[in-house]
């Protein structure tokens, strides 16, 4: 191919390019400097050549490979067009390009290089497919400068419908295609050459110098300029094992080395090659940081060990080092430690070096505060100026004093309405109001005589301003950075986790910013007749909208923070970094997020205090009462919504526990009343002896049986695993379908039994469902009363007691004898197996005559009574029980096919449940 024929024309010359022309020294990367050209000029000027694919040795025996080659009709061919710049001048311009050409010869099989002729013939463009890039055949082809590809390239092109690619180097697979790598820290040339070769075989590109085009840095150490630049640019820094493991998976289709799940296993951890020690931390914090050090690839040693590379210092506590550090030891602040974990790379130490807190001016000022009383006016004046300077330099934090952890845990959201009228119980905020959104319009004017009403109004404004600052801190320091795109090391939290944590905080911030601005206008232009109550009435609807969603889900927000902090080290580091900032007042995110929970009761206290100091003739007196009422209404909504939220959570638990539970069980008006564990005593709603769970809701009854075989765990897209569903849905029954509740008398053969007489709307007969309660926690009498009360509420009847009837077990052929015996369990298992075979032809026996006799005979053992009445015979029993029969049909209790199936399609009558 070195002496390819050239066709000359007046416009230029075109040559089939020798692969050597596209050597790495010329093009650096295979396709970056190539233009995908059209074949228009080639058809006119290119000599006719023949493209062909040659399967070498084992490649010719792979049926999958041969089948894939038959679907590929095109390959890329490199060409060089030689174009003269001007006629008569010797200057020539080389235009390199890659064109697509048809594969005229499908494929040729070859056993050895020697037997194949025409390797260098200009009449052919040959592509050799080799299965092993380590054997002698590959080496011979490589030395002959032939185009060599691996089977994965062919399979990939066939799958995607792409032409066979051109590469100036042997290309086994495309698992590193479009990746640009740079290496640092390698001292053994042989290892570096091996890694570079593998990258080229997988389609990757190598850069000697680090620049913005480099996608990955492969590092053998954590020092050097390339490492620091990669950290600053957020470029992933990888171990050499990443390349080796990717090469091991070279034959896998659809594998790509840059996929996060694979790549993250081989990222250089932040503390690789680092040995840390810690100073100034509590035992608990130190233990936590030592565990994080090992987790992030580092080691730790006791303080003062000469082998340590870094000393991490708690700069807020440590004022002086206990020893003189060596020149090789980095003494850094704790922010370096947490920052490295957050960015998932070792941060530069120079930005976080620990320095002693030297404040000579302050020391000089404080030194003047001696025990000796100044004897001159000059000393007194200097002392006064020093104290004034200290007071000006002291930044009063807008945050209240930090509470004990026990105080936080003792807070109950449900106690929001428990508002004391003592102003001493309100939080003592700082005296200097600050605003994160804008500065105050003017300094607060002080009336000549400060009234108590003005003092309380000023405190209300100050606390509101501080509260807005706290909300702004939450948003600016926590929420906004977490939501930013292009975070170094990838997103710290998933979007749904961020939404769960912060909820409606931005909406709360917007409302209170407006309230603060209105209060500021009122304070600046103070007048006793100005109405403060109008401000809160103005935004009462906004408060109702924004607060309940956040306060009701605060516990969920708190749990999400704790869970993510344990599972995600970068999030833990992010919280630690921000907690150390002065804006947070050394408080955690959970402690800051609890402020909205506390704010409304605090405002109500101040408004109550303001009302006390407002004259009766002042119009704001009545307005304040309305404002306090509106705040209580908001807190009432919070408590009601909290109860609704808990009720909805219970329904969700039922849905997850019951496999196949209908979706229409979820409804805003529905709540779970009681759960009862029972055993089925009849053939319906499931086989006798089956464990059945009844979920009583305020308007329906969910019937579920215990699963015979537990299904696999449910895994959400976010990796959280739910317990497997332990129950199987049978039927969701509206309470309106329950016509009577039968209290079965206690006998030797029947204990704790009851029955339900139901009328499905799609059937012409009543159905008897009998159960035995298995738990003694809830007495049967209480359960039946509860059930009848909700049935009566559903059908809009006041006489719930009339729904209960007492009956003898013999009348309905109900007994609980031997329910748990081995023989009974074996019998049920045999019966269940036989039903699977003959279900289509089986006709279950029914207690037809027994139930007819119990319901239709004028004298029997059934006595209609209320739960509170004494048992006695009722002579007019036929008339009293006629409602049980419904339709006087001989097939009154024929068991319908409605309960023959183990799961049912919802009937039309259940649509009202939605």
Swiss-Prot record:
Ranges of compositional bias, category Polar residues: 418-429
* Outcome after substituting residue 846 to A: Diminishes its phosphorylation status
One Pfam family here: BRCT
Modification note: Phosphorylated by PLK1 in vitro. Hyperphosphorylated during the G2 phase of the cell cycle. Phosphorylation at Thr-373 occurs during the G2/M phase, relieves its auto-inhibition status and stimulates its GEF activity. Phosphorylation at Thr-444 in G2/M phase is required for subsequent binding with PLK1 and Rho exchange activation. Dephosphorylated at the time of cytokinesis. Phosphorylation at Thr-359 is required for its transformation activity in cancer cells.
Q: Which residue range or ranges hold the BRCT domain?
A: 171-260, 266-354
PTM sites of type Phosphothreonine: 359, 373, 444, 846
Q: Which residues form the PH domain?
A: 675-794
What is the recorded phenotype of mutating residue 586 to Q? Complete loss of GEF activity and failure to support cytokinesis
Q: Mind naming one GO cellular-component term on file for this protein? A: cleavage furrow
Which CDD domains does the record cross-reference, listed alphabetically? BRCT_Ect2_rpt1, BRCT_Ect2_rpt2, PH_Ect2, RhoGEF
* Effect on the protein of changing residue 656 to A: No effect on GEF activity but severely decreases ECT2 activation by RHOA. Fails to rescue the cytokinesis defect caused by knockdown of endogenous ECT2 in contrast to the wild-type protein which rescues this defect
Q: Principal localization? A: nucleus
Location in chain, cross-link Glycyl lysine isopeptide (Lys-Gly) (interchain with G-Cter in SUMO2): 611
Effect caused by changing residue 184 to A:
Inhibits interaction with RACGAP1. Abolishes targeting to the central spindle
Renumbered residue ranges of the record's region Disordered: 388-449, 857-884
Residues where N-acetylalanine occurs? 2
PANTHER family given in the database record: PROTEIN ECT2
Domain comment (free text): The BRCT domains 1 and 2 are required for intramolecular interaction, but not for intermolecular oligomerization. The BRCT domains negatively inhibit its GEF activity in interphase cells. The same BRCT domains may act as a positive regulatory motif for the completion of cytokinesis after the breakdown of nuclear membrane during mitosis.
Q: What is this protein's name? A: Protein ECT2
Organism per entry: Homo sapiens (Human)
């Amino acid at each position: 191919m070195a002496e390819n024929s050239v066709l000359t024309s007046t416009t230029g010359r075109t040559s089939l390019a020798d692969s050597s022309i596209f050597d790495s020294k010329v093009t650096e990367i295979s396709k970056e400097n190539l233009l995908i050209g059209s074949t228009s000029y080639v058809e006119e000027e290119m000599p006719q050549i023949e493209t062909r694919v040659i399967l070498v040795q084992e490649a010719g025996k792979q049926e999958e490979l041969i089948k894939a080659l038959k679907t590929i009709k095109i390959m890329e061919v490199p060409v060089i067009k030689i174009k003269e710049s001007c006629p008569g001048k010797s200057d020539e311009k080389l235009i390199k390009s890659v064109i697509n050409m048809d594969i005229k010869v499908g494929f040729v099989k070859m056993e050895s290089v020697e037997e194949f002729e025409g390797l260098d013939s200009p009449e052919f463009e040959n592509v050799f497919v080799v299965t092993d890039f380590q054997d002698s055949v590959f080496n011979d082809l490589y030395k002959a400068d032939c185009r060599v590809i691996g089977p994965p390239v062919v399979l990939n092109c066939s799958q995607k419908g792409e032409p066979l690619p051109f590469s100036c180097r042997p290309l086994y697979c495309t698992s590193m295609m479009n990746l640009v790598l740079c290496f640092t820290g390698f001292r053994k040339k042989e290892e570096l050459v091996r890694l570079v070769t593998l990258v080229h075989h997988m389609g990757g590109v190598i850069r000697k110098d680090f620049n913005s085009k480099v996608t990955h840095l492969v590092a053998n150490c954590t020092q050097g300029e390339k490492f620091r630049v990669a950290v600053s640019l957020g470029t992933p820094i990888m171990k050499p094992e990443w390349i080796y493991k990717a090469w091991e998976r070279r034959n896998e289709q659809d594998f790509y080395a840059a996929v996060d799940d694979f790549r993250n296993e081989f990222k250089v951890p932040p503390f690789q090659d680092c040995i840390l020690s810690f100073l100034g931390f509590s035992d608990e914090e130190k233990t936590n940081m030592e565990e994080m050090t090992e987790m992030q690839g580092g080691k730790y040693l006791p303080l003062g060990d000469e082998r340590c590379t870094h000393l991490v210092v708690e700069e807020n506590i440590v004022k002086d080092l206990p020893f003189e550090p060596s020149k090789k030891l980095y003494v850094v602040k704790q922010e370096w430690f947490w920052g490295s974990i957050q960015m998932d790379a070792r941060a530069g130490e120079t930005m976080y070096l620990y320095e002693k807190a030297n404040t000579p001016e302050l020391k000089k000022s404080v030194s003047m505060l001696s025990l000796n009383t100044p004897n001159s006016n000059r000393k007194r004046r200097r002392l006064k100026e020093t104290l004034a300077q200290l007071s000006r330099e002291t930044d009063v934090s807008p945050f209240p004093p930090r509470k004990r952890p026990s105080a936080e845990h003792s807070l109950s959201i449900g106690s929001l309405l428990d508002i004391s009228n003592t102003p001493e119980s309100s939080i003592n905020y700082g005296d200097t109001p600050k605003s994160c959104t804008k500065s105050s319009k003017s300094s607060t004017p002080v009336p000549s005589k400060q009234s108590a009403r003005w003092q309380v109004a000023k405190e209300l404004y100050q606390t509101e301003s501080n509260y807005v600052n706290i909300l702004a801190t939450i948003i600016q320091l926590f929420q906004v950075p977490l939501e930013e795109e292009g975070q170094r090391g990838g997103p710290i939290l998933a979007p749904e986790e961020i939404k769960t944590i912060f909820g409606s905080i931005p909406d709360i911030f917007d409302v209170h910013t407006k309230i603060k601005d209105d209060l500021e206008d009122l304070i600046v232009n103070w007048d006793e007749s100005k109405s403060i109550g109008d401000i809160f009435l103005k935004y009462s609807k906004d408060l109702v909208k924004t607060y309940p969603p956040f306060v009701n889900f605060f516990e969920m927000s708190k749990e999400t923070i704790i869970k993510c902090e344990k599972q995600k080290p970068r999030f833990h580091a992010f919280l630690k970094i921000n907690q150390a900032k002065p804006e947070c007042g050394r408080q955690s995110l959970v402690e800051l997020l609890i402020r909205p929970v506390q704010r409304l009761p605090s405002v109500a206290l101040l408004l109550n205090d303001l009302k006390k100091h407002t004259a009766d003739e002042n119009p704001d007196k009545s307005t304040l009462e309305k404002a306090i009422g509106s705040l209580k209404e908001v807190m009432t909504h919070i408590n009601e919504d909290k109860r609704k939220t808990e009720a909805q959570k219970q329904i969700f638990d039922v849905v997850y526990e019951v496999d196949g539970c209908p979706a229409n069980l979820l409804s805003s008006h529905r709540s779970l009343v009681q759960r009862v564990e029972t055993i089925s005593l009849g053939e319906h709603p499931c086989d006798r002896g089956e464990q059945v769970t009844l979920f009583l809701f305020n308007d329906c009854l969910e019937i579920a049986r215990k699963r015979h075989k537990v299904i696999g765990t449910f895994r959400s897209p976010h990796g959280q695993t739910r317990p497997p569903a332990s129950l199987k849905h049978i039927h969701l029954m509206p309470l309106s379908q329950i016509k009577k509740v039968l209290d079965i008398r206690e006998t030797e053969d029947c204990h704790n039994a009851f029955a339900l007489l139901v009328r499905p709307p799609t059937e012409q007969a009543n159905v008897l469902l009998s159960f035995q309660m298995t738990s003694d926690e809830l007495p049967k009498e209480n359960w039946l009363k509860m059930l009848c009360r909700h049935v009566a509420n559903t059908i809009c009847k006041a006489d719930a007691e009339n729904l209960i009837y007492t009956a003898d077990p013999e009348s309905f052929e109900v007994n609980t004898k031997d329910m748990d015996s081995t023989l009974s369990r074996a019998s049920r298992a045999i019966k269940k197996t036989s039903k699977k075979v003959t279900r289509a032809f089986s006709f279950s026996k029914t207690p037809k005559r027994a139930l007819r006799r119990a319901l239709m005979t004028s004298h029997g053992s059934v006595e209609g009574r209320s739960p509170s009445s004494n048992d006695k015979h009722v002579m007019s029993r036929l008339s009293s029980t006629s409602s049980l029969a419904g339709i006087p049909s001989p097939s009154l209790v024929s068991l319908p096919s409605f309960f023959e199936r183990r799961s049912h399609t919802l009937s039309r009558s259940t649509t009202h449940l939605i």
